[in-house]
C-alpha cells in the first residue's frame, strides 16, 4: 500500500463504496472489500495468492495452458465497480467506486523495479504491485 502523506486519509477512502472481490477470475459471486487494507492483504499476504503466483511463474515456461488454468484460480478485484453479489456483468452494476487501476504488461525487467519504486511514492497510488507473471505492474 502507498504510505504517501499526501494521499487521502484512509477514513475518507473507506467511506466510499468499496470494489468487489471475486474468489477467482471465473467466479460470478462477489462481495465488496471491507477496507482499503484488504487489497494489500489479498495481494501481498494471502497464502493462496502466494501459492498460485509461485505455481504460475514456475509453469509459464513449461506448460502455458496449465499456467493459464492456475491464473484463472486467482482472486479478481474489480476496482471501478461494486457489483451486486450475484453477478459480474453490467446488469449487476451496483455502485461506482471512483477508483482506477493502471495495468502495464510486459515491462522490461531492467526498468520494472524502478517503475515499481517510483509508482510506490506517488500520492495518487493506493496500491502498487507486480502482476502474477512478475513481468507487469499494477497501480
Describe the residue ranges of each PLM region:
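Histidine-centered divalent-metal-coordination microenvironment in nucleic-acid enzymes
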Residues: 102, 120, 124-139
Amino acid at each position: 500500500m502507498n504510505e504517501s502523506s499526501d494521499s487521502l486519509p484512509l477514513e475518507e477512502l473507506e467511506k466510499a463504496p468499496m470494489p468487489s472481490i471475486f474468489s477467482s477470475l471465473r467466479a460470478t459471486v462477489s462481495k465488496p472489500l471491507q477496507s482499503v487494507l484488504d487489497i494489500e492483504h489479498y495481494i501481498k499476504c494471502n497464502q493462496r495468492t502466494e501459492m498460485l503466483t509461485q505455481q504460475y511463474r514456475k509453469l509459464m515456461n513449461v506448460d502455458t495452458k496449465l499456467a493459464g488454468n492456475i491464473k484463472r484460480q486467482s482472486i479478481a478485484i474489480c476496482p471501478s465497480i461494486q457489483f451486486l453479489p450475484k453477478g459480474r456483468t453490467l446488469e449487476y452494476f451496483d455502485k461506482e467506486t471512483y477508483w482506477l487501476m493502471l495495468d502495464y504488461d510486459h515491462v522490461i525487467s531492467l526498468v520494472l523495479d524502478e517503475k515499481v519504486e517510483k509508482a510506490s511514492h506517488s500520492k495518487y497510488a493506493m496500491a502498487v504491485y507486480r502482476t502474477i507473471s512478475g513481468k507487469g505492474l499494477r497501480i
